[in-house]
C-alpha cells in the first residue's frame, strides 16, 4: 500500500478499545506529545469510555479510532479543547508504530479536517507539536498546517 492509497475510516471508541487506550495513555514515550504525564488506570479509562457522550458540544472533545478498511486499528485521533465560540479545536493524533510511514497519518488528518469543516463547521484546527518531533511537523505541514508560534520552555 502506498502513501496515496492508505484508506482509513474513523469510528467511535468502543469498550473493546480499552486495551489500546491503556497502551497509548501509559506509553511514556508518548507523554511528550500530549498534555498528560501520568499513567491512567484501566478503571479511569473504562469510566471515560462508558461515560463519554461522543458529543463534542457536551464533552468539548471527541476521540475516534483510526482503522483500515479491513477493520485493523492503526491509531487514534481526537479533537480537544473545542471552542464553539471561535469555531476551533486542537487535533491530536497517534498512529501506532507498526503503521507509521504508510500514509495513515495523512489520510487521518484529511478525514478529521473534513469532519471538522463539513460536520462541525469549524474554521480552525491547531496542534501543539514538539519541535523535536520532525515526523509530526512534516506530516502536519504536508497537510497544509502552518507553523505560527514556537513556545519556548513550554
Model-flagged regions — what are they?
Residues 1-18, 27, 68-154:
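Acyl-donor (CoA/ACP) binding surface of acyl/acetyltransferases
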Residues 15, 39-42, 60:
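Generic alpha-helical scaffold signal
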Residues 18, 29-30, 54-57:
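Generic structural signal for secondary-structure transition and capping sites
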Residues 20, 44-47, 51, 107, ...:
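Alpha-helical elements of Rossmann-like donor-binding domains used by nucleotide-donor carbohydrate transfer enzymes
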Residues 23-24:
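Conserved catalytic core of Hanks-type protein kinase domains
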Residues 29-51:
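Conserved GNAT-fold acetyl-CoA-binding loop/helix
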Residues 43-46, 54-57, 97-98, 125:
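Short, intrinsically disordered/low-complexity patches at protein termini
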Residues 52-65:
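A short helix-loop-beta-strand connector motif used in the catalytic cores of GNAT acetyltransferases and
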Amino acid at each position: 500500500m502506498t502513501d496515496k492509497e492508505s484508506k482509513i475510516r474513523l469510528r467511535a471508541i468502543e469498550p473493546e478499545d480499552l486495551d489500546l487506550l491503556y497502551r497509548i495513555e501509559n506509553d511514556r514515550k508518548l507523554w511528550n506529545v500530549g498534555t498528560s504525564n501520568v499513567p491512567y488506570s484501566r478503571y479511569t479509562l473504562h469510566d471515560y469510555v462508558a461515560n463519554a457522550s461522543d458529543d463534542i458540544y457536551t464533552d468539548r472533545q471527541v476521540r475516534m479510532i483510526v482503522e483500515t478498511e479491513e477493520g485493523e486499528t492503526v491509531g487514534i485521533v481526537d479533537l480537544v479543547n473545542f471552542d464553539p465560540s471561535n469555531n476551533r479545536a486542537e487535533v491530536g493524533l497517534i498512529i501506532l508504530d507498526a503503521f507509521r510511514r504508510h500514509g495513515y497519518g495523512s489520510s487521518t488528518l484529511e478525514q478529521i479536517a473534513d469532519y471538522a469543516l463539513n460536520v462541525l463547521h469549524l474554521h480552525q484546527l491547531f496542534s501543539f507539536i514538539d519541535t523535536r518531533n520532525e515526523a509530526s511537523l512534516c506530516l502536519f505541514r504536508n497537510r497544509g498546517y502552518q507553523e505560527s508560534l514556537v513556545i519556548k520552555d513550554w
